[in-house]
Regions:
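Juxtadomain coupling helices with adjacent low-complexity linkers
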Residues: 3-19, 46-56, 64, 101-132
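Structured interaction and signal-relay segments at domain junctions
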Residues: 12-79
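Short amphipathic alpha-helical interaction segments
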Residues: 78-82, 111-114
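A short beta-strand signature within small-molecule sensing/ligand-binding domains used
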Residues: 79-91
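Short hydrophobic/glycine-rich mini-motifs in sensory/regulatory modules
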Residues: 90-100
Length: 132
């Protein structure tokens, strides 16, 4: 059972907004799976299990952004097509509920400050929303 499950439609609207604002593929996950996608690969990514590396990043409770020259970290388990560009964990009352992610193929990685701040803001908003 996912606490984020009830937010699927709302998360979809947020992903659409992030995608329109940045032109990047935006994803929202719960602790196990992708619950919302906006951008090119929606059908390929929706409901897929997240990678163990993404789980570890979320548990670290810090925002992650790919740095040039580093190997890409896969978004999904057993799927090397999409990689983590920017990840902000969704925290509610100290618990990790999921993450806001910008993703792209490995050769297109390169999020900047805009993606960082947007992911941070949406993750904080969702965390607060879940507390109420």
């Amino acid at each position: 059972y996912s606490l984020m499950g009830g937010l699927t439609e709302f998360a979809g609207q947020l992903c659409d907004t992030l995608n329109r604002t940045t032109g990047r593929t935006a994803v929202i996950t719960d602790r196990d799976n992708i619950i919302s996608v906006s951008g090119a690969p929606r059908r390929e990514l929706m409901d897929k299990q997240i990678s163990p590396d993404l789980e570890r990043l979320m548990e670290g409770r810090q925002i992650y952004q790919h740095k040039g020259g580093e190997d890409g970290i896969p978004l999904c388990d057993n799927d090397g097509r999409f990689f983590l560009d920017t990840v902000a964990p969704i925290l509610s009352e100290g618990d990790v509920l999921g993450s806001v992610v910008f993703t792209s193929p490995e050769d297109e990685l390169g999020g900047g400050e805009v993606e960082y701040k947007l992911a941070q803001s949406i993750a904080a908003f969702l965390g607060k929303h879940m507390e109420s």
